[in-house]
């Protein structure tokens, strides 16, 4: 009897089974292009991204309409959008170029459900989109998400106030150079796929003025123009022609989001 049990045990000796190729394989960590998403600690990032959809941004797509309820907020990952304000019967003027370092839906952070501004896609790309109610819920329940988004509000306030000063004090050439440098930073590319019409609207000036100034920059070898395309050839020289406002805006953005000391000068 014992022999039979031993023989049975030997015949059914445990051998390692071949592994399922998919078993034990970890999904590679996703790379997030949006700066705000990247800055969140892992638990908060997982909570936020878990409520988001990955969506395409199409040219001239309206992401936010003035004085209408906000259904979604966006964390752009690629491309660029233009946040604009209106002044009576005049054409809208850009108050912020929004890219992969930004967030669309600031009123939701502040407890509002409508925005006084429009936001339209200028350069196609992708974004993480979250429903307005889901974002409000996360802001209330996760202090890290709340703190980061409030810091972003601070950066945006500095951006808007600096633009007001720039538009009233500096020449068209300085302002255009500033706009190109900020667009290059938002897109993380030396190539800016926009028309003179878009730039004229962004700066609140006539298109003829943009065409003349851009022609001068091209003649000096600082940029190269194509069909709805601008390439920055000499960023250093463009910075020399620009006012200091682009540095103030970009530095304030970084310092606001990096802030660990509330007494630190944001735009130092």
Region locations from a protein language model:
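Structural motif
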Residues: 80, 125-127, 229
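Alpha-helix/helix-capping structural signal
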Residues: 43, 78, 133-134, 155, ...
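Cyclic-nucleotide recognition modules
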Residues: 96-154, 158, 162
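Polybasic "coupling" helices that flank or enter modular domains
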Residues: 122-124, 139-206
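A conserved hydrophobic position in a structured secondary element of the catalytic/binding core
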Residues: 40, 76, 98-99, 122, ...
């Amino acid at each position: 009897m014992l022999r039979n049990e031993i023989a049975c045990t030997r015949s059914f000796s445990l051998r390692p089974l071949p592994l399922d190729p998919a078993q034990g394989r970890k999904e590679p960590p996703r790379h997030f292009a949006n700066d705000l998403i990247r800055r969140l600690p892992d638990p908060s990032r997982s909570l936020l991204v878990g409520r988001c959809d990955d969506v395409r941004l199409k040219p001239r797509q309206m992401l936010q309409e003035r004085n209408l309820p906000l259904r979604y907020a966006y964390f752009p990952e690629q491309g660029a959008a233009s946040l604009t304000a209106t002044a009576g019967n005049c054409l809208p003027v850009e108050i912020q170029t929004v890219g992969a370092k930004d967030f669309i839906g600031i009123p939701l952070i502040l407890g509002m459900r409508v925005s006084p501004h429009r936001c339209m896609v200028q350069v196609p790309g992708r974004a993480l989109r979250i429903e307005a109610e889901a974002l409000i819920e996360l802001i209330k329940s996760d202090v890290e998400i709340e703190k980061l988004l409030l810091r972003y509000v601070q950066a945006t306030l500095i951006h808007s106030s600096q633009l007001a000063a720039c538009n009233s004090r500096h020449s068209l050439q300085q302002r255009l150079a500033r706009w190109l440098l900020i667009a290059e930073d938002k897109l993380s590319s030396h190539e800016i796929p926009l028309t003179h019409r878009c730039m004229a609207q962004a700066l609140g000036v006539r298109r003829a003025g943009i065409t003349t100034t851009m022609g001068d920059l091209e003649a000096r070898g600082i940029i190269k123009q194509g069909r709805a395309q601008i390439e920055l050839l000499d960023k250093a020289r463009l910075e020399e022609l620009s006012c200091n406002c682009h540095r103030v805006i970009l530095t304030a953005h970084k310092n606001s989001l990096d802030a660990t000391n509330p007494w630190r000068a944001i735009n130092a």
